[in-house]
């Protein structure tokens, strides 16, 4: 037993060790390398096959092995690898060598020195064989590419410790493989030589010298193979000719044009081997902002020199290099592959092209948390620099610390830091206790200012010190006034600066004071010493060698874009002078640098390339004509129309001819549909970098690599489409079986599909043919000339000769000739020359470059030879649907002179000349036949009649004879009976007996046989017939006997047997018959019953199904009708506006409801009779339907819907979300009760379930303080109890506007310090609520000033009337759906993927009169409102779109519910955005939600669907709400013209802390008064540039009227994508029209052609009805012109991180508690800490903004120091009780991820303890965004995707055991 386990265990471990050992892996890799066959094998085999002697064989093998050994050594030795692996090595070595070798083989006498008698090793040929094999082994292989193996090596070399052992073992493995391979080759060759069958082959025997010839020509065969290899390599190498150097963007130009530059990736897929060392060398980051250095090695050397020595030096070193050395090294081994990369892949329109050779991941060891770990995002530059230092510093000075010492040191330093911070914090707190002023104790923030008195500071938004390190980016695109207010710059400084690298990485802390003193100031004044703040953090991080540190990011300089005016800056720069570290005070460079966040600098190419399209755009605008650098798709420019006008020549005489020519041509671009894999490649770049691809199809969507052949579905040899073959069989089988019978509609659909497939197939074939003509050289010229020849031949030779022949024939047959008609038809035929695509030009005009681009010849009214004219006239009056045949009265000419309906289509069948003749002959023959057959028919009928009569007569005679015979028989019988009747009367006669017996037998037999017949149907027809015959004969006999008896036994005494009377017999017989019949029928019924049942069930099922389908339709119809009626009723009530008591509204509603149901039912019935039901279900959302149901208590109490809601399966009609929620309404406990009408009813409880952490999504995304919040606070505090009248409203409005103006200044663009303070206060309070969660019993973070669950309103004054919605729903979270703000805020939302262009609208609706969005109706225009003077339909001015309707009278709410005020959501509805729209409405409409925000819940969804397609005058009824009774004359509209709004967008988009271009309506509201007057002036330029589209102007450079116009142009271009949708509006009919127009324009008298083309239906009149000046508005309305927003990249900053982290927070039951009284009680009941919070909460509600409690003591410290303290507290958490509470929870195995948490039951009371622990563990004593910082500085994670990883899994590592 022991032996067994010992053996088994050891064997396994031994096997594992052997398999994982370096030697085995090396052997395996070496063996694999054997199969990587390259050109060297060719020479090795040549030496064997040619039998040139053993010396040559040995030298070949030796050279081969030596070459392979060199390759293996190159794996280990990086310089050799780099030399051999570069593609340019192939350029230099391979091609000349191959060519030389090729010629050497062909012309041996040039190099043949003759055989020498000396030592064979000195023989030149043997040496050459050795060299060949050696050198060829170094080249790239091409059967198994070495790059695949190289990647394997790279992976293993990174893991492997003993690299030399690996190289050796891999070489040995290769050697073994090679020996085996060569042995196998030798055996094969030996077998071929020895095999007799090959020699005795008939072919070889017939030519006895063939074998010797083959042997002699072997050298020639090898040289041919060598030539093939040459060609193969030629395709892979970069061109050795020096290509044009790309135009580099200079530093200033690059910075200037950066706004429009294109951010691209460069795909480099060279097949070189990259080792780790190569990566280290090549992936070094670009040290400067401008990547130009990498372009030129000279420059690189120079800058390195400058950086290392810290001074500016002369270029001394350069003199030591010879010029050709530099040039050669650059040409051959430059990393950038000479001039250019391979491919551009466009991403964005912001920056230069990214260089993707720079690896995103760089592995290196780093010291983190006192332990050495591998960091995968280590800066490569830091690594190389550290290696340089290590080389230069002697080894004795560096001592290696043990891991334990490192860890202890880390712990100690952390403790020290924490101790120092805590002491400082304590000191500050003590000072506060002693009564010091709070402002003195508070740690002050460092400001960035340009004078000592801090009078001129930067605005807070732009201050890099105030905004935190990860938010300190400089915003782009400032307008002039803001910039002037914020800072004054005298010159436009655009220099480059280098920071001393050594100083940055190894800072000397003692020099800090000196370092600060030596910094020069911005604008030649001292910068505040506080600049130390940012540099301090840099040095600390450098000291701790944080892996994610990247000092080169410091040299990033803000870019700027120069527009027409020279002085306008697009960017604000924060500049200060460079660092001085030289003792002589000489600056490194006296230029400015910009500080930006420390991050990875993306290396970029120093030039940008454009493609043809961009070049065309640039040409149109600026007239620049640079050659495009990127290859575009294959295309041909086809000129379809040239505009020749005398007047233009006079106007454009000043211009050059080429310009005017260009402007006057209208051309189409025809793209080739062929696979074009050169597309997007950079012209002149290396093709060697492309992967090996094979293109085997005519049209191949993607490039296929042979590597993935096995993945491709269809192989070449057997591509059997089994499913395709099965389909027809299945279809036939299903058609026959009655169970699988398909309906007619399905069959039609299938036919339609097949037809479409066929058409598609034909079209593909046509395209294939056209592309084939395009690809073959000179094919177009040949085809064109053939077409022209065929055209002439047809028109002038074939057709005239046919006409002559026909008419001569007619004359010979004595008929009138038709010369005139035929010649008229012949003249009518026109041969129109067309472009290759089929655009018609004219009969005489050929398309431009038709010999190269191709030509089509279209035949209009093709001549058709007919034997006589006028024969086809009858077809005109047929069914109009069949006229389609007549319509196509044209064709295209093929190369062979045939006719085809479409270019390159299959030739159509031409009508035969003789067919009508044969038809006519047939008709005549039929007439003759008809007459002949009539005669025959008559004769036939006569003969038939004669036969019939004779037959009848014969039959009659026979009958008479038979009758006589029967009478005679009967008489004989009667005689016998009369003689013996009295004696034998009582006995039954013999025949009677027999018959009875036989009858019994037959009955029995039939009874036995029948069941057998029922069960199986196997009785033959014959048997059945016999049986039937026998029964009938028996029946006849019985009847006859009965009759005889009746006749004979007339006397009573003869009746001896009393029961056998004749009547009884008859009755029994009839009963028997009935019984038998019933038996038969029941049996048949039983047999067929199952089919009846089945059929019956199916009918019932179908009926039920149809009923259920109709239910939602009927319901929807009812609600539609009721909605309309109730709106009408309510409007009527408002109009009358009297105080009379009407009917009780609820009853009225009920009556109205019932009447509408009846009415709509009748309508439905009528519709059912006439046509199918049609209801627009999109009118109402399901939520609204359920709401209406909940209001109607009778419906609920009857529980009609309970079964639907309780059904747990997939309900076909109700969305799951709504179904789940609605179950709350129909609670089964309250089954027999009426629904309570109390304030907290079930409906409201149900609504409470809809929350997003009880904050709307908008709220989470924007928890930072915004201007609107402060503004609304101020607005609220103005109001008092009597503020419902007009005056207070006016006052409020004025103050509101005044406040906005005040806030608009650039200096005060941030909220005041108090507001800032309040913001931090709220944050900290929120975090403290989390921390102290376990002390509070069940309360959630109710009391925080954010008012998360309490007053979700903004803090109000006690006197302020709160919005009605708070009362209506018992304070439930309406804000989950509607944002809190009253002015619509379209600020940053993390869910927005698009730039919200809907809010721009600018000139889009230019000519549409849209009634205000405040007017609402479900679709009817009610004009009676105008009677009472209520201006319901206030039209927006032609240019005005956005304005707000501010109501001046807000009446207290009435108690009765309004129809449309459901859920109380109409309070201030037009201002509230819907943040969670997707939860109830269909997600398709979410994109339109900006417009919808203004009037949510009431706008019929139909209007959203028909956004631009509605009527030109959309008018809607006024929003009528019980909460707001508004008189129209008291409305004031703050209107903003759309262009003005656009201008505002440009002015203000940089003020907001969001992406550039994300506009905000509030900015418009702020500036509306100032800009009201400019509206008319500003709209002109927009119209001018966009409303008109003029071909001639497009080519000229556009002169901007103003900078604003240019800015607008730039803005539109950059953030919006404009595209035309051609498929719909510019459809085939339109294109057909255009083709006809092209022809008509060229004709002198186009009338006839025009009329005929209209008759043929080729030119459609309805399409012709186009406005002369199509405005942009109409194009948009029709859906032709589409404006899409460019996708924005959202900056995932602190708010978003907070949103993400809170997303996994756990849900608690008590969260649903919403009663304010309960909450206030809770404030008092909690401990003192919560009490103070309650005070604070109440203080906020009281609106006392001047008083703040310093509740959160940490506010004394600055945020950065606060963060440091908290992080240190967290990691030295031994003092806290967090871990001690529940150590089990902190077991690493027990830590669950967020998914597990969310999968648990929603009610987490069962897991409360662990929840608390999780929260404490997740939220230690630091703010939410500190998590991001911790990730950045402690866990080396910069990426958000790894954020959750650290949050959930990494914390337990730091627990104190």
Curated annotation (Swiss-Prot):
A Gene Ontology cellular component where this protein is annotated is: chloroplast inner membrane
Q: Which ranges are annotated Acidic residues under compositional bias? A: 256-268, 281-304, 612-625
Region annotation Disordered: where it falls in the sequence: 246-304, 612-631, 740-764, 1547-1579
Q: Does the keyword Transmembrane apply?
A: yes
Q: Name one Pfam family in it.
A: Ycf1
A GO biological process of this protein is: protein transport
Is NAD set as a keyword in this record?
no
Q: Which InterPro entries match?
A: TIC214
Regarding the membrane, this protein is recorded as: Multi-pass membrane protein
Q: Where in the cell is it found?
A: Plastid, Chloroplast inner membrane
Q: Which domain of life is it from?
A: Eukaryota
* Keywords, sorted A to Z: Chloroplast, Membrane, Plastid, Plastid inner membrane, Protein transport, Transmembrane, Transmembrane helix, Transport
Q: Where is the composition biased (Basic and acidic residues)?
A: 246-255
Q: Where are the transmembrane segments?
A: 18-38, 64-84, 87-107, 124-144, 172-192, 221-241
**Whom does it interact with, and what assembly results?**
Part of the Tic complex.
Spell out the family assignment given in the record's similarity comment: Belongs to the TIC214 family.
As for what it does, the entry says: Involved in protein precursor import into chloroplasts. May be part of an intermediate translocation complex acting as a protein-conducting channel at the inner envelope.
Please report the name of this protein according to its UniProt entry. Protein TIC 214
Which species is the source of this protein? Drimys granadensis
């Amino acid at each position: 037993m022991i032996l067994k386990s010992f053996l088994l265990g050891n064997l396994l471990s031994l096997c594992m060790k052997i398999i994982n050992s370096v030697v085995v892996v090396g052997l395996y890799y070496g063996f694999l390398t054997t199969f990587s066959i390259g050109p060297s094998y060719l020479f090795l085999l040549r030496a064997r096959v040619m039998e040139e002697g053993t010396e040559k064989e040995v030298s070949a093998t030796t050279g081969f092995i030596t070459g392979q050994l060199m390759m293996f050594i190159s794996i280990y030795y990086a310089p050799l690898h780099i030399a051999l692996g570069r593609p340019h090595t192939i350029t230099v070595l391979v091609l000349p060598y191959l060519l030389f070798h090729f010629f050497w083989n062909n012309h041996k006498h040039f190099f043949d020195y003759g055989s020498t008698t000396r030592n064979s090793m000195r023989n030149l040929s043997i040496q050459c064989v050795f060299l060949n094999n050696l050198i060829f082994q170094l080249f790239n292989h091409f059967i198994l590419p070495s790059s695949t193996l190289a990647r394997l090596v790279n992976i293993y070399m990174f893991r492997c410790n003993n690299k030399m052992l690996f190289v050796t073992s891999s070489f040995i493995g290769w050697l073994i493989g090679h020996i085996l391979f060569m042995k196998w080759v030798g055996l094969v060759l030996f077998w071929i030589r020895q095999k007799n069958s090959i020699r005795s082959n008939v072919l070889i025997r017939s030519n006895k010298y063939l074998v010797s010839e083959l042997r002699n020509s072997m050298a020639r065969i090898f040289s041919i193979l060598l030539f093939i290899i040459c060609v193969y390599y030629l395709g892979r190498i970069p061109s050795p000719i020096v290509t044009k150097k790309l135009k580099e963007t200079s530093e200033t130009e690059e910075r200037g044009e950066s706004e429009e530059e294109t951010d691209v990736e460069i795909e480099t897929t060279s097949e070189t081997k990259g080792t780790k060392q190569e990566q280290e060398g090549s992936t070094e980051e670009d040290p400067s902002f401008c990547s130009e250095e990498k372009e030129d090695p000279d420059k690189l050397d120079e800058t390195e020199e400058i950086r290392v020595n810290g001074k500016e030096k002369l270029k001394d070193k350069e003199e030591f290099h010879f010029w050709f050395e530099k040039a050669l090294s650059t040409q051959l081994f430059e990393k950038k592959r000479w001039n250019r990369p391979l491919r551009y892949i466009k991403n964005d329109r912001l920056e230069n092209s990214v260089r993707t050779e720079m690896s995103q991941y760089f592995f290196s060891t780093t010291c983190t948390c006192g332990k050495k770990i591998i960091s995968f995002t280590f800066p490569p530059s830091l690594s190389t620099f550290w290696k340089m230092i290590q080389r230069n510093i002697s080894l004795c000075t560096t001592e290696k610390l043990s891991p334990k010492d490192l860890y202890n040191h880390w712990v100690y330093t952390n403790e020290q830091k924490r101790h120092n911070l805590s002491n400082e914090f304590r000191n500050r707190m003590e000072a506060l206790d002693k009564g010091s002023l709070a402002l003195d104790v508070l740690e002050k923030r460092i400001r960035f200012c340009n004078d000592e008195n801090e009078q001129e500071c930067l605005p807070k938004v732009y201050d890099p010190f105030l905004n935190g390190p990860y938010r300190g980016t400089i915003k782009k695109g400032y307008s002039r006034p803001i910039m002037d207010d914020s800072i004054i710059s005298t010159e436009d400084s655009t220099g480059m600066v280098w920071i001393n690298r050594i100083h940055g990485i190894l800072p000397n802390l003692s020099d800090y004071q000196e370092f600060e003193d030596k910094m020069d100031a911005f604008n030649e004044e001292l910068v505040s010493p506080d600049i130390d703040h940012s540099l301090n953090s840099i040095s600390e991080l450098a000291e701790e060698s944080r892996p994610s540190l990247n000092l080169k990011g410091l040299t990033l300089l803000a870019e700027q874009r120069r527009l027409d005016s020279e002085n306008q800056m697009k960017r604000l720069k924060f500049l200060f002078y460079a660092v001085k570290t030289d003792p002589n005070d000489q600056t490194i460079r006296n230029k400015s640098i910009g500080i930006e966040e420390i991050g990875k600098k993306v290396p970029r190419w120093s030039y940008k390339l454009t493609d043809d399209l961009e070049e065309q755009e640039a040409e149109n605008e600026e007239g620049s004509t640079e050659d495009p650098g990127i290859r575009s798709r294959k295309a041909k420019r086809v000129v379809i129309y040239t505009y020749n006008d005398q007047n233009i020549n006079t106007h454009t005489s000043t211009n050059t001819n080429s310009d005017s020519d260009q402007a006057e041509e209208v051309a189409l671009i025809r793209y080739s549909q062929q696979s074009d894999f050169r597309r997007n490649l950079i012209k002149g770049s290396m093709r060697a970098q492309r992967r090996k691809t094979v293109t085997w199809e005519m049209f191949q969507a993607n490039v296929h690599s042979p590597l993935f052949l096995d993945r491709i579905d269809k192989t070449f040899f057997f591509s059997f489409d089994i499913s395709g073959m099965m389909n027809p069989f299945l279809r036939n089988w299903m058609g026959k079986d009655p169970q699988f019978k398909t309906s007619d509609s399905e069959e039609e659909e299938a036919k339609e599909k097949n037809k479409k497939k066929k058409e598609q197939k034909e079209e593909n074939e046509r395209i294939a043919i056209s592309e084939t003509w395009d690809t073959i050289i000179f094919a177009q010229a040949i085809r064109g000339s053939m077409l022209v020849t065929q055209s002439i031949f047809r028109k002038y030779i074939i057709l005239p000769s046919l006409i002559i022949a026909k008419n001569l024939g007619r004359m010979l047959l004595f008929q009138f000739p038709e010369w005139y008609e035929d010649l008229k038809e012949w003249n009518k035929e026109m041969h129109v020359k067309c472009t290759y695509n089929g655009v018609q030009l004219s009969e005489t005009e050929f398309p431009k470059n038709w010999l190269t681009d191709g030509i089509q010849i279209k035949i209009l009214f093709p001549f058709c030879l007919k034997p006589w004219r006028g024969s086809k006239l009858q077809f005109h009056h047929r069914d109009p649907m069949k006229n389609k045949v007549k319509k196509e009265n044209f064709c295209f000419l093929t190369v062979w002179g045939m006719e085809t309906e479409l270019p390159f289509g299959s030739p159509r069948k031409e009508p035969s000349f003789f067919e009508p003749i044969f038809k006519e002959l047939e008709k005549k023959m039929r007439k003759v036949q008809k007459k002949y057959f009539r005669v025959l028919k008559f004769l036939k009928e006569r003969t038939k009649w004669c036969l019939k009569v004779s037959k009848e007569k014969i039959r009659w005679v026979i009958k008479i004879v038979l009758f006589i015979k029967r009478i005679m028989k009967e008489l004989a019988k009667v005689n016998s009976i009369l003689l013996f009747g009295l004696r034998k009367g009582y006995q039954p006669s013999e025949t009677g007996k027999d018959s009875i017996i036989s009858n019994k037998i037959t009955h029995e037999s039939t009874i036995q046989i029948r069941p057998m017949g029922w069960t199986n149907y196997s009785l033959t027809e014959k048997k059945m017939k016999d049986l039937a015959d026998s029964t009938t004969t028996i029946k006849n006999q019985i009847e006859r006997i009965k009759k005889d008896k009746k006749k004979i036994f007339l006397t009573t005494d003869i009746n001896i047997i009393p029961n056998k009377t004749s009547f009884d017999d008859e009755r029994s017989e009839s009963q028997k018959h009935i019984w038998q019949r019933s038996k038969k029928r029941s049996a048949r019924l039983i047999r067929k019953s199952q089919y009846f049942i089945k059929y019956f069930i199916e009918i019932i099922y179908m009926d039920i199904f149809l009923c259920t389908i109709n239910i939602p339709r009927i319901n929807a119809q009812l609600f539609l009708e009721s909605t309309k009626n109730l709106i009408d009723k309510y409007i009527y009530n408002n109009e009358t506006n009297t105080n009379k008591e009407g009917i009780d509204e609820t009853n009225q509603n009920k009556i109205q409801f019932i009447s509408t149901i009846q009415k709509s039912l009748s309508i439905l019935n009528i519709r059912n009779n006439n046509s199918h039901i049609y209801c627009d279900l999109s009118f109402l959302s399901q939520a609204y339907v359920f709401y209406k149901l909940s209001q109607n208590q009778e419906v609920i109490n009857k529980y009609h819907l309970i079964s639907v809601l309780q059904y747990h399966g997939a309900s076909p009609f109700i969305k799951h979300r709504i179904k789940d929620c609605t179950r709350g309404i129909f609670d089964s406990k309250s089954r027999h009760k009426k629904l309570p009408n109390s304030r907290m009813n079930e409906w409201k409880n149900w609504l409470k379930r809809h929350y997003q952490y009880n904050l709307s999504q908008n709220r989470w995304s924007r928890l930072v303080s915004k201007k609107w919040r402060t503004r609304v606070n101020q607005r609220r505090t103005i109001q008092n109890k009597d503020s419902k009248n007009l005056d207070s409203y006016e006052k409020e409005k004025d103050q509101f506007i005044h406040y906005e103006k005040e806030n608009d200044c650039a200096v005060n663009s941030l909220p005041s310090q108090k507001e800032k303070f309040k913001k931090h206060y709220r944050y900290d309070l929120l975090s403290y609520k989390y921390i102290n969660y376990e002390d509070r019993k069940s309360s959630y973070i109710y009391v925080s000033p954010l008012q998360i669950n309490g007053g979700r309103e903004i803090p109000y004054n006690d006197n302020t009337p709160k919005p009605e919605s708070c009362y209506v729903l018992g304070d439930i979270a309406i804000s989950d759906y509607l944002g809190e703000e009253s002015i619509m805020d379209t600020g940053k939302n993390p869910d927005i993927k698009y730039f919200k262009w809907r809010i721009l609208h600018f000139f889009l609706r230019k000519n549409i009169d849209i009634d205000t969005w405040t007017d609402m109706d479900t679709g009817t225009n009610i004009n009676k409102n105008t009677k009472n003077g209520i201006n319901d339909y206030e039209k927006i001015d032609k240019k005005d779109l956005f304005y707000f309707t501010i109501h001046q009278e807000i009446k207290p709410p009435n108690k009765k519910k309004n129809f449309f005020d459901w859920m109380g959501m109409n309070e201030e509805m037009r201002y509230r955005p819907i943040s969670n729209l997707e939860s109830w409405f269909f997600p398709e409409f979410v994109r339109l939600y900006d417009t919808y925000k203004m009037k949510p819940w009431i706008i019929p969804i139909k209007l959203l669907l028909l956004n631009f397609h509605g009527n030109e005058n959309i008018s809607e009824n006024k929003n009528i709400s019980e909460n707001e009774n508004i008189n129209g004359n008291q409305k004031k509209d703050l209107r903003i013209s759309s262009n003005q709004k656009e201008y505002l967008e440009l002015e203000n988009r940089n003020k907001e802390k969001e992406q550039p271009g994300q506009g905000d309506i509030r900015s418009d509201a702020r500036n509306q008064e100032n800009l009201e007057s400019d509206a008319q002036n500003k709209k002109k330029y927009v119209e001018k540039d966009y409303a008109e589209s003029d071909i001639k102007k497009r080519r000229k450079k556009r002169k901007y009227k103003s900078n604003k116009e240019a800015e607008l142009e730039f803005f539109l271009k950059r953030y919006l994508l404009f595209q035309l949708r051609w498929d719909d509006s510019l459809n085939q009919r339109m294109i057909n029209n255009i083709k006809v127009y092209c022809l008509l324009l060229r004709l002198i008298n186009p009338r006839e052609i025009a009329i005929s083309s209209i008759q043929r239906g080729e030119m459609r009149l309805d399409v012709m009805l186009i406005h002369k000046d199509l405005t942009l508005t109409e194009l948009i309305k029709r859906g032709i012109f589409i404006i899409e927003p460019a996708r924005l990249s959202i900056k995932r900053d602190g708010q978003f991180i907070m949103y993400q982290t809170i997303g996994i927070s756990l849900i608690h039951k008590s969260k649903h508690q919403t009663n304010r009284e309960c909450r206030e009680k809770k404030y008092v009941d909690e401990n003192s800490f919560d009490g103070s919070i309650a005070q604070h909460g109440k203080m906020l509600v009281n609106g006392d903004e001047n008083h703040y409690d310093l509740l959160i003591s940490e506010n004394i410290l600055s945020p950065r120091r606060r963060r440091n303290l908290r992080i240190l507290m967290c990691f030295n958490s031994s003092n806290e009780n967090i871990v001690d509470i529940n150590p089990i929870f902190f077991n690493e195995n027990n830590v669950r991820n967020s998914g597990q948490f969310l999968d648990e039951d929603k009610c987490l009371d069962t897991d409360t303890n662990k929840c608390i622990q999780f929260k404490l563990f997740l939220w230690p004593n630091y703010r939410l965004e500190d998590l991001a910082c911790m990730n950045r500085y402690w866990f080396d994670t910069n990426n958000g995707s790894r954020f959750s990883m650290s949050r959930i899994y990494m914390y337990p590592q730091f627990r104190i055991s």
